């Protein structure tokens, strides 16, 4: 009985430590809600690294109406985009990730791109974050197969005012935001899955017809 009590005490201390760390990080990353991007806004463009020396561009898949995609000749078809900011210290992110992965598996062959934007490195200088696990191996162990993009300096995080995590954005093929979410709470898994799936179906139905690539 005594051993069980000690074990429970240790677990409690560990959980409180994680919670305190997360609270400290969020406080250090104070945000201004007035700068939030809203549905109908044009999503800020970005280029983010996914491997050393290799970059993904939002404009490869989604661009303002009337403008061509970045690689129009080889990839002329607009896609809807789902992007979620996360960090390995973020506990609510760990609740959102399995749902995103399940939805991704359902739609990965459709005209919609899923991106996880990691800000772990951008927040590593905050006290307590020095030894956080790197996102790639961390997510691989959790069975996450979505594309990870690394916002190592937090530049894109600031453009999207995504300091409170997880922070999710959905946009159509014209880079117009159609859904935004901040945070994730236990018990909303079913609601989130339904909301995400319905919006994806709507966006896919509204995409323009496929075009042939011009090599």
Where are these regions (language model features)?
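N-terminal targeting signals for export/organelle localization
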Residues: 1-61, 179-181, 212-215
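Structural microenvironment flanking redox-active thiols in thiol-disulfide oxidoreductases
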Residues: 94-141, 152-159
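Hydrophobic beta-strand anchors of alpha/beta hydrolase catalytic cores
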Residues: 82-83, 114, 168
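Aromatic-flanked redox-active Cys/Sec active sites in thiol-based oxidoreductases
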Residues: 84-90, 118-120
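A generic structural motif
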Residues: 61-64, 163, 184
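Thiol-/selenol-based redox modules, centered on thioredoxin-like
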Residues: 170-215
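Structural micro-motif
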Residues: 143-147, 161-169
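A short beta-strand-turn-helix
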Residues: 47-81
């Amino acid at each position: 009985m005594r051993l069980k009590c000690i074990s429970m005490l240790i677990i409690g201390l560990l959980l409180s430590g994680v919670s305190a760390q997360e609270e400290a990080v969020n406080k250090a990353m104070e945000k201004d809600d007035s700068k939030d991007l809203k549905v109908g806004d044009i999503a800020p463009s970005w280029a983010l690294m996914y491997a050393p020396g290799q970059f993904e561009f939002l404009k490869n898949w989604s661009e303002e109406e009337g403008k061509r995609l970045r690689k129009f000749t080889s990839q002329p078809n607009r896609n809807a985009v789902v992007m979620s900011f996360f960090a390995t210290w973020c506990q609510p992110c760990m609740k959102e990730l399995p749902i995103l992965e399940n939805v991704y598996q359902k739609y990965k062959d459709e005209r919609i791109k899923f991106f996880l934007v990691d800000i772990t490195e951008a927040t590593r200088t905050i006290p307590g974050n020095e030894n956080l696990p790197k996102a790639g191996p961390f997510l691989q162990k959790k069975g996450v197969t979505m594309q990870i993009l690394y916002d190592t300096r937090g530049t894109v995080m600031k453009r999207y005012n995504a300091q409170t995590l997880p922070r999710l954005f959905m946009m159509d093929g014209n880079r117009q935001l159609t859904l935004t979410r901040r945070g994730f709470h236990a018990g909303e898994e079913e609601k989130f899955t339904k909301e995400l799936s319905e919006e994806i179906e709507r966006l896919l139905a509204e995409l323009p017809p496929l075009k042939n690539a011009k090599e």
